Every structure is written in C-alpha cells, then in structure tokens.
C-alpha cells in the first residue's frame, strides 16, 4: 500500500485558569471579539415566523412536475440540517462545559455560533448557556444569515461600533500586523456584521418578497460562509507565547506587544489578538474555510468541470454532483441571472434545485434556488438528537416535534450521501489511492471529533477472511474485560466501541494531532494551572501518560 499522509498541527484548546471554573456573567476581554454585539440590532425574528411562508407548499405533485420537493423548501431543508440544530448538539454542550472549566467565560465564543438568537439577544451570559431560552436551541437561524453583511463594508454596512470593528480598516498592514489589505474583513469565529434595518437580504434582484428586502451579493460570496467556518481560540491567540499560529506565519499583534512579551491577562480588549488580526492568523482550532481558500476551487468555474484532472471528475463524486446540479439550471453551470458560478461553499453545500422559495401566489419557480439543507458529513448529530429526544435528555426539555424529527431523518440521509461523495478509492495492484473530492481537507472541521481510517479485509480462496485491518467493534481492556461507560438514560452500562487496534502498523488513521509547546505549558503553570493536569491518557485504561508539568520540562 502506498500512502501520502499530511499531519495537521493545531494548538490545543487549553487556556488560562485564573480561578475556579464557574460560568462568567461578564465576558473576559480575551474572549471578546469584534462584530455586531448583543443587543445592538433589534430586528431579530424567530425562525417560526419564516416557517409561515417558506415551508409547507411543495408536495408529491410539485415534485413529479419538476417544481420542487418538500426538502427543497428553504425552511424545511434548514430544519433538518446541522445549522438549525447546532444548539441541540450534545457534543457541543459537552465541549462547552469543558471549555468553561478551562477558562471561565470561554463559552461565549461557542454560543456566538451555536445559539445565534441567544447570543445576539443578550442571553449568552452566564457563559455556560444557562440563561438561554428554549427557542435559542435553533442554532444558526434564518436572520443570522439573512441579515449578514460583508464585514469589509463593501456593500451594505452593518452595525459595528468601535472598538468592535471586524475588519482591517484601522489596523496597520504587514509586516507590523497580519492584515493583507486595509479592506480585509475578519472572516471567522462568527464575527458577523448584521444589518440594522427591517429588510431581509438574499441574492436575487427580482425577489417578490412580502417583507422588506434587499439584494445582497454577499450571500453568494465564499467569505459569507467563512464568517463562521474558520474557528480560532482568541484566548490562545492573545496569551500563548506563539499565539497559536503556524510556524513561520506572520507576527500576531497581541497584548504581549504592549508588555515586553508578557501577556496581559484581563487587559483592555483593544490590545487583544482578536481586535488586531484576522482570525485565520491566531489560535488555530478549525480551518475549513482557509483550507478551501488555499485550493484552486475558489477561482474555478463550475462550467469548467471538464477541465479538472480526471481523478476529480468521478461520477457521483462531490464535484461532479455539484456540476450536474448547476447544469440543471440551464445556464451551463452559471447562475440563472448570468452571474458566474464557481465551485464555492454554497455551490456544494447549498446545491441549486428547481422550486419556488415561498408559498405566495404568483412567485416564480426558480431553476437555481439554493437548497437550504447545508449538508455536510455530520449524520451522527441526528442520531444523538433522536436518542436524547426519545429519552427526554435534550438540553432544552420541550424537545422537537414529529415534523422536525422527520426533517432530521431526511437531513441524516443527505449527510450520509455527502460522505459518500467526499472521496473515491482506486485500487491498482497492491496500491490504494485515496482521492479527496471535496473543496477542503478530506477530514475537516471540529478536530476533536473527526477522523478517517481504512477498513481493509484481506480474503483468500473462496472469499475466506485472512486478516482485517482497521476493524471497528467493542473494546476490551488488557485483562479482557469490557470497557464500559455509564448509560445516560439509566439501565445497564454500555460497552464502548471504537477502532480495535489503532496502533497496529497495518492500520491507517487520519486525524488531527494536537500539540502544545513547552513554553505554553510553562506559562500555564505560572498562571496558576496545576502541573498535574493530564495532557494525554492511555487507551483504554485512562492512565495519565503525560502531565502539564512533564510537558513544561520538555526541551523547547
């Protein structure tokens, strides 16, 4: 087997602890970030208002007639997708709890995207999410996108009040700071610039909306999606000795620049990294958007699909399916209004369909309505929500409706479909070639919860199984005893399932490997963090294999 493997280097999401971990009522300046702030826009509406018009009008008859299926309705597709359910994600809530233990107030960063309505409505403090309303579980809601303006102020100008300006206009350029140009917006971390008027925004010039409306070209811009899908840790960005940046990356301006290289915990926000640098520059956590921007796809028109390398033109692969969906609009791959369509985030994750956008009489059937399902690969989210709903374990107790559950099931199927489109495998003699058919790294996004591996079964004469590499199944400890965890719904403990022999030389696992420097570990200890804090564990017995103190003693 021949394999090309690239390692991803991340700064561990570990931050200063100044006191016992309790939810913060005031967001620390290290966690504060630019963009529209809570309470600054008063025109936010519940998604239930959008449901009145943007769902419930497509049916079997319209689908047969080629005029749209129920899943093509904006609200219906959204309701079954990951964005609508970001505030219900149990992994999010578990991660939020851990972040709050590490740094009091860190949860504000998480809630900014996972509960947009709650954050902009001023309910994100206490920062453990205990102040949120039940309706805030809708996650990334309609107004979060349809009030978003470009933070570089190149089109409609959203609400941003100094010092919360999410662009480089007031910042010196390289080499003094990491901005490339004075017009560069801060795209990442949910630092949105929201429109303060009553209009909803969308990409069409001819929308016959029954509410105030403005055309926004930003809705088709890839920076629109980048506004959330580069995630950086602003605390690491400001306080860590290397600011959590890539090796040899440009200098990151932080509070350390004001105090002779010493971080100023709790200092003015104007000194902090998040207020002086684009988010891709510091505190690396997730880089889906940056991965995409580093590829050739942002400048490749969908109509140029046939010029792509043969390996990428796999029938049924992500790029080919996107190409076919765009062709159906009848404009050789471009938008129906003549605008050039590139292999953008929207082209792949909001593929065009033929449907009306609302239930009002006389609305045109558009050949390139963007499907609002935002499908990715996270099908397991639906499994968890369904389980918690069935056992009354959802974070917000009122649960979800039967209709919502049906949309979740449909969303799960779309996520599985996207996973199948993401890669192709080519076997040539004793070589296996893995081809990435996505616009970013093949595993991307949340690095603590994503991995990919090869499950290879070697068979002999008659199909007899000779060996299996990368097998997945129930775990046992070194004594042959089942590895069990507590059943959250009560009843018998549950045996853990995972990759059975992850350290075997024949097993290929692709995942992010975290790392911190010894200087960062020493800085954490100097700030009051216990040197006994576990940094790594044995699997599956949970024995500590390295502490923070041991990490700090490693050579620089």
Q: Would you name each region that the model predicts?
A:
Residues 50-53, 110-113, 142, 225, ...:
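Short cysteine-rich clusters marking metal-coordination/redox-active sites
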Residues 107, 112-124:
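Conserved, well-structured interaction surfaces
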Residues 25-33, 60-95, 127-556:
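Primarily the internal scaffold of c-type cytochrome electron-transfer domains
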Residues 9-19:
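Bacterial N-terminal signal peptides
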Residues 97-103:
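Membrane helical hairpin/interfacial module
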Residues 43-48, 103, 107, 137-139, ...:
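Residues immediately within or flanking Cys/His clusters that coordinate Zn2+
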Residues 24-64:
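N-terminal module-boundary/linker segments of secreted carbohydrate-active enzymes
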Residues 1-10:
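Bacterial N-terminal signal peptides that target proteins for export
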